[in-house]
């Protein structure tokens, strides 16, 4: 598996030097005889026929593993049943999809049949009859042949290469399991074998073979800072394979105690008596230490008897010198009582301990609800943090459960209660969440495993509109898949008019007497929260919040930044006085100038909300204003300041993935640093309290993992007409020139061919700023026609009006066609340029094999010269076929199986006829115009085809079953309503 190299590899995080006993003579590779070389040659010829490359996806985050696509190695251990051995961290604890590629490049689907709860091995199954052109060989498992000094070969897919053969010598047999860190899978209670073979990512699961071609260990991990590799002994893997071949259950026992192999000198310091040390050394002369209890889990079988620091002497009167012996006893004693003898502080103590079934504390199910997934807390995670094996663990945050606000942690959360009801286990959690109606706001109490001392509380919105899936996934070891059970029928019957009007009171700002006219503005601010269920239009966030300005309290109209409301496929809530929350809807989104208008139901809020008065007079440099806004702590701040500049700005586009940005905008900046710490606010006339500008945040480019945002003011004259039209019940119907322009100084204009007469006219028209504008970027038209304007054009006038301000450009854009005078290639021309209707926001998204597809949105057309297809990849899910087969965001899918797909409807008509678990050929063109072909395997079980489409003002969902389009209706809800009516 590619990410298998870790830096932490010892219990204390330090690197242990590779030392061989002095009595062992390590032969140099250059001194090998011709016979040895020939022996290795024939060995490798045999071994490679059993080694496979595993291309796999862990399709859902579960337990310690996140959803991931990777590659690893495995080797055949049984040719009749078709069993391949590999690592447990490859098979994974959760859903697995993968295939094996044999040495002759034949391919075969893999099905997981066993993953060990603790140790790093697992088994996959393939159909031997599918391999037609190769005589598949199996490797014998011979763990007893692993000895210090044994020359070995690691045969696998090192660094993702098809076949690599690495050589080395075993240097240690008694190493503790490597420590890979917290919140991730770790092996424990086993010895590891150490060697220096310099293996890297992709070699996980490789067989470690001796010169006889026998597998003596399993490659598992290594150190990133050295050439040291860690191999898992095959003793327990061999026993598990024998159970599987016999058709028996692989029993695994535990007493919930983590043991560590500690050297005798350390054991003496922990209380080991001289007599017991002598006895141990006589019984096991080759051992260097004893097993010591490192962690005893609370509420586990050992909790009442064992304690940390206990030195293990025997189990059921059998002296213990290794983990292998301990595992053997416990695995055969599941459900029984064992007698454990330890030495504690120099005294021998014997106690009885119940042996628990290890599989019973290894989760094999999870529930998906409200966009997140949950499971029972696992033994793996409980051991790391020494806590009881109980509780509800969040496998994947998302939707209504975005618990990553604390330090941006995406995993490691444990939910203690929902709606003030404790959730000690998954079954209780399902009952509690099923009883909560859609749209209800409930409290959540939760903690993070890294900081269990801190209890967190939050209020969440239960969203089943966008995240309607409520299903239980249970592992099926017969089929290798996870079976889904729909739980949505457990939802309560929806109630109408559940939102009750509530009262809120605003706090008064502490203003000087001279600014008292601005005090009512504090009651014009509301907090706007936007939860984004699906990533479309390239927008990089899933949740945004800031403040908006109430521009009509009677109609419930709120002005807000488009960096908060990127599109209307979202859940919007409006909060008044940090007391009352009501839903909001998107009424209008300006295509260029970074503002949107929302609407809420005024009947739901009883508060003294003020309609902000908007000025029609543009601000000028030097005008005195009062800034009022909310900082990042949601506190209202005010300051007197002056307008320092009003200038046309150019916000850089995001090079990696286009998303909405403000264009052709006059930015207002002020002589104060306080507004820069606020994402929203107003610039008001201190004497009258009239709003002169709206302060907002603009989404900028993303560089080196950092998202840039620009905070500035936009003049009220920019949006006043739009607000007035919406107030009057008229649609805004904004039209605009679909180009990006930037200011040009007079010296640039002269050099590029602007005549002295035009320059004189500019200087007379705009006394504050002598400027013209040039076209720096043209958007690719929706209809495929060519643009009338070209990059480099210097615009002189629009419809006969001199163009020295961006306000003139906005006013002229309302017409379907405008007359423009310009300078092109030093020649003055007059052209007719069509304008673009703003009603082109994304109205359809298709979910296919983990990819989110849509029509190329406006930001794409602004940055690309040619639209290759109407099927644009907006995002993709981790662990999905789209991710596995390298279908990346910003790609265009132009053909499917040779059929052109110019739009989403054609695409759907083609792909819905393709059977599950078959390959499809795609022609793809990248954003940089590079075309390539690729294949992708369908996986409808975990990634079914679906569609969401805007019909009128509502988004409607569709699913595809057997190639037929089915509208997602509330069938389950209707059944419940009918049943409730019958009962009444």
From Swiss-Prot:
Enzyme class label: hydrolase
Enzyme Commission number(s) from the entry: 3.4.21.-
GO cellular component, as recorded: nucleus
Serine protease as annotated region, ranges: 51-241
UniProt domain PDZ: residue ranges: 268-346, 756-826
Pfam families to which the protein is assigned, alphabetical: PDZ_1, Trypsin_2
Localization per record: Nucleus
InterPro entries: PDZ, PDZ-like_dom, PDZ_sf, Peptidase_S1_PA, Peptidase_S1C
Active site annotation, chain numbering: 89 (charge relay system), 120 (charge relay system), 203 (charge relay system)
Function: Nuclear serine protease which mediates apoptosis.
UniProt-recorded name of the protein: Pro-apoptotic serine protease NMA111
Annotated source species: Yarrowia lipolytica (strain CLIB 122 / E 150) (Yeast)
